[in-house]
């Protein structure tokens, strides 16, 4: 199945096949979600079957909206598809744009809508093994330190988020 995502072609937002957008390095829309419980962040380790960055640690979930899908609907859909999380209140933290080489000749050039959820109770997480091989809750400071000392264990986008945008994501400053 060809998944069509919103990407900019010659300055116009158009439906583009997802893999083609990555091969061409086209700027495209994406979402990233960070679920917090107290001072910890829910992280996922990407399944080994993923077509890029397999086995690396990433934020709670991230994906591309389908053409004509809202960012908020996309975030909720992907939380369920990857981790079977439902009914989490999501707060929009604004947009972040980045460009990163993710290997195999693929480029992520994303305009990402960031969402967060702060859970007072620890949610039940059931990873979809086709998407996620492992999850963990990691203290924010410990995560920042690990990203600096062992960057190759983390996806390029999580490294960018933690090193350049974490105040925006965590809500300690406005977007």
Predicted features, each with a name:
Residues 82:
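Short alpha-helical functional segments enriched in proximate histidine and acidic residues
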Residues 33, 61, 92, 113-115:
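A structural signal for short, well-ordered beta-strand segments
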Residues 86-95:
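A short coil-to-beta-strand element that immediately follows conserved catalytic motifs
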Residues 17, 55, 97, 106-114, ...:
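Nudix hydrolase/Nudix homology domain
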Residues 22-31, 36-77:
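Conserved Nudix-box catalytic region and its N-terminal flanking loop in Nudix hydrolases
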């Amino acid at each position: 199945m060809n998944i069509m995502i919103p990407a900019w072609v010659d300055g116009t937002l158009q439906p583009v096949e997802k893999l083609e957008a990555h091969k061409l390095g086209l700027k495209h829309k994406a979402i990233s979600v960070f679920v917090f419980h107290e001072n910890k962040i829910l992280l996922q380790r990407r399944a080994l079957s993923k077509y890029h960055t397999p086995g690396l640690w990433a934020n709670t979930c991230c994906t591309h909206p389908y053409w004509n899908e809202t960012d908020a609907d996309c975030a909720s859909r992907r939380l369920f598809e990857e981790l079977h999380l439902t009914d989490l209140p999501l707060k929009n933290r604004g947009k972040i744009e980045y460009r990163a080489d993710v290997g195999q000749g693929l480029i992520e050039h994303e305009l990402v809508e960031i969402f967060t959820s702060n859970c007072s109770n620890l949610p039940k997480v059931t990873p979809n093994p086709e998407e996620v091989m492992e999850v963990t809750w990691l203290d924010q400071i410990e995560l920042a330190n690990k990203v600096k000392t062992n960057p190759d264990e983390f996806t390029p986008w999580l490294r960018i988020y933690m090193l350049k945008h974490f105040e925006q994501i965590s809500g300690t400053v406005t977007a």
